[in-house]
């Protein structure tokens, strides 16, 4: 592993040999070749007749190349170059064409383009015109690290790496008006947009996460809470032209996904605006005076490795990534996100704002179908790998997109000892002493770390610990490998959850059926009890009525005069009375007896005269309609008569 001083000299020699001025790109190429200067130069400038020879030994290729044996390398000094065989490389008169790979994204399509670095940007657009059927004048090709470029720009002048990612914008073309637009809008409503909002007056950035269903008005109100600038005094830059109404939801406003940069300031008077412009111009002039000597004076003024190997466009760090002894993890992560954006740009993973326990809840303690992996990014400012890892790997569009879709990303800064100790305590509590000891023993140059956590039924499992000395492809491969393991476990969890839910549904249905059965039985029992009570009541009434009738019958029977004999001195009338059942009642009465006595006799036999009537046949008449005080002789029921009992209607 080369020392920091050696790396400074290797970096300077590499830029001098290749002409690459972009420090980030140069560091990336050297990292890919493990800081082997010769291998890195050969990767950028391949030769026809052989490769450059290192003064550290190795096989010598034939040809008029430099002979290291005849020129021994002197001992390295702080002012000497770590790479001596540079000049002989110019003796090679011709270089092989360098091929560049481009992956261009347009809406839901990816187009792969392979061109020589001697081609122009316009040739890429011509290929895309055939593939995407988009006219070149309507096409904006974005994603260049150097900013917007002209169509006539030669690719070689951009000093691009071998693999590049670009995207196409077509602001002058109308969006597709097919039926899929509604589905795309619905999908956008469910997406989360990261708005990177710069407060112009204080030069501070806020990373705010909003759902697609949030409105522009809600964004402005949240910014008011952060900046104390009332909505009516907010002056915005960066909103799409389609965002003309504050009631419009973010999914319809045309924001870039997953990140979009905005700038907000306070509306001021013309005098204040002119004064601020003069101050800003002065500040810019002062900064530009010192920019040219930053790199040359780095070692002289004791600038640390992180600043030497940092992004070319970044300035000196004004604040730490995370405050020391932060009591609230959410506030600490807000500062971390803002500082991360200011250092590495607005396209970065969406860091979860909240405690580690809250991140667990968001990732693991939901329905199996909604669970995600948890990615924990551990930052360290004193590591030489940090800036390259953040700017080239962690902020790569492919990594950002994959993390936002499949992971909950949580971050912590281990630069300060207090924050490091606090995280180790959390790590020991949630992941066990083994993982805590692994992180504790990591050296500074092995940071940053990327932990991939999968939630299980009773514990949290660390699937992978990714160190900072990696590449975008390797990082993506390890993320995808973790995702495969998680997907297999997720399918099992979904199956178990569905089975458990099915069992619970069956149990609920059984409980409901049992409850309904109990209610039906109770209702039936209550109805039966009511019926029995009604029957008992009616039976009691019937018995009382029968007893009453029996008492009346007995009293009438006792009140009847004795039946006269056939040989009585007084005239006797013999009556035969046929009952409804066909039986006959026979009795003798004195002809002088009143008709009421006959009625009482019939009633004493169970046929009360108010329910039955007596009928005679010749002549046919209703005897019960006659005057009961008349004698039998007076009503012609003498000497004998046959009568019929008939129930009254």
From Swiss-Prot:
Stretches assigned to the UBX domain: 568-645
Record-annotated UBA domain positions: 1-57
InterPro entries cross-referenced by the UniProt entry: FAF1-like_UBX, FAF1_2-like_UAS, FAF1_UBA, Thioredoxin-like_sf, UAS, Ubiquitin-like_domsf, UBX_dom, UBX_domain-protein
Highest taxon listed in the record's lineage: Eukaryota
Keyword Hydrolase found: no
Chain coiled-coil ranges: none
Locations listed in the record: Nucleus
GO molecular function: heat shock protein binding; NF-kappaB binding; protein domain specific binding; protein kinase binding; ubiquitin binding; ubiquitin protein ligase binding
Keyword Glycoprotein: no
Compositionally biased tracts (Low complexity): 68-82
Phosphoserine: residues carrying this PTM: 319, 581
Function statement: Ubiquitin-binding protein. Required for the progression of DNA replication forks by targeting DNA replication licensing factor CDT1 for degradation. Potentiates but cannot initiate FAS-induced apoptosis.
Record protein name field: FAS-associated factor 1
Organism of derivation: Mus musculus (Mouse)
Lineage, uppermost ranks: Eukaryota, Metazoa, Chordata, Craniata, Vertebrata
């Amino acid at each position: 592993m080369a020392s920091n001083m050696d790396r400074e000299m290797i970096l300077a020699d590499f830029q001098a040999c290749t002409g690459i001025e972009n420090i980030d790109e140069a560091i990336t190429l050297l990292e890919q070749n493990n800081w082997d200067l010769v291998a890195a130069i050969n990767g950028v400038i391949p030769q026809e007749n052989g490769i450059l020879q290192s003064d550290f030994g190795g096989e010598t290729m034939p040809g008029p190349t430099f002979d290291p044996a005849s020129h021994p390398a002197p001992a390295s000094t702080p002012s000497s170059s770590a790479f001596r065989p540079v000049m002989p490389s110019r003796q090679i008169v011709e270089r092989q064409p360098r091929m560049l790979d481009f992956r261009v994204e347009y809406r839901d399509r990816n187009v792969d383009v392979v061109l020589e670095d001697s081609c122009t940007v316009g040739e890429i657009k011509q290929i895309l015109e055939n593939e995407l059927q988009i006219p070149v004048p309507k096409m904006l090709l974005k994603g260049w690290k150097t900013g917007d470029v002209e169509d006539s720009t030669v690719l070689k002048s951009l000093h691009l790496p071998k693999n590049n990612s670009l995207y196409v914008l077509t602001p002058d073309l109308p969006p597709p008006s097919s039926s899929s637009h509604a589905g795309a809008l619905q999908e956008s409503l469910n997406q989360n947009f990261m708005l990177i909002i710069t407060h112009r007056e204080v030069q501070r950035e806020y990373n705010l996460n909003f759902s697609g269903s949030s409105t522009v008005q809600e964004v402005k109100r949240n910014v008011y809470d952060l900046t104390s600038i009332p909505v009516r005094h907010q002056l915005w830059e960066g909103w799409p032209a389609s965002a003309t109404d504050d009631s419009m939801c973010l999914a319809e406003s045309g924001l870039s996904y997953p990140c979009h940069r905005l700038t907000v300031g306070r509306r001021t008077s013309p005098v204040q605006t002119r004064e601020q412009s003069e101050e800003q111009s002065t500040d810019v002039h002062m900064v530009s005076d010192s920019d040219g000597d930053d790199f040359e004076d780095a070692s002289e003024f004791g600038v640390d490795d992180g600043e030497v190997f940092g992004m070319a466009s970044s300035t000196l760090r004004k604040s730490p990534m995370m405050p020391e002894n932060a009591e609230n993890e959410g506030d600490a992560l807000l500062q971390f996100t803002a500082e991360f954006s200011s250092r590495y740009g607005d396209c970065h993973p969406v860091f979860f704002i909240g405690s580690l326990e809250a991140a667990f809840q968001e990732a693991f303690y939901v329905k199996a179908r909604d669970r995600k992996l948890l990615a924990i990014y551990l930052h360290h400012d004193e590591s030489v790998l940090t800036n390259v890892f953040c700017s080239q790997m962690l902020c790569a569009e492919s990594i950002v997109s994959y993390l936002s879709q499949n992971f909950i990303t949580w971050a912590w800064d281990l630069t300060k000892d207090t924050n490091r100790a606090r995280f180790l305590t959390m790590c020991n509590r949630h992941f066990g002493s083994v993982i805590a000891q692994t992180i504790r023993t990591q050296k500074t140059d092995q940071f940053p770390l990327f932990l991939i956590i999968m939630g299980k039924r009773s514990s949290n499992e660390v699937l992978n610990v990714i160190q900072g000395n990696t590449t975008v492809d390797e990082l993506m491969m390890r993320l995808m490998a973790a995702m495969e393991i998680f997907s297999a476990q997720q399918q099992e969890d979904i199956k178990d959850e569905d089975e458990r839910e099915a069992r619970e549904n069956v149990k609920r249905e059984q409980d409901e059926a049992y409850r309904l059965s109990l209610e039906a039985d109770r209702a039936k029992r209550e109805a039966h009890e009511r019926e029995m009570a009604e029957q008992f009541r009616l039976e009691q009434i019937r018995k009382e009525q029968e007893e009453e009738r029996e008492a009346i019958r007995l009293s009438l029977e006792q009140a009847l005069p004795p039946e006269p004999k056939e040989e009585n001195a007084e005239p006797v009338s013999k009556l035969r009375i046929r009952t409804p059942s066909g039986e006959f009642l026979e009795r003798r009465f004195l002809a002088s007896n009143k008709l009421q006595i006959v009625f009482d006799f019939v009633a004493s036999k169970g046929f009360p005269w108010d329910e039955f009537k007596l009928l005679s046949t010749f002549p046919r008449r209703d005897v019960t309609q006659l005057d009961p005080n008349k004698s039998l002789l007076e009503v012609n029921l003498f000497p004998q008569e046959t009568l019929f009992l008939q129930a009254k209607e």
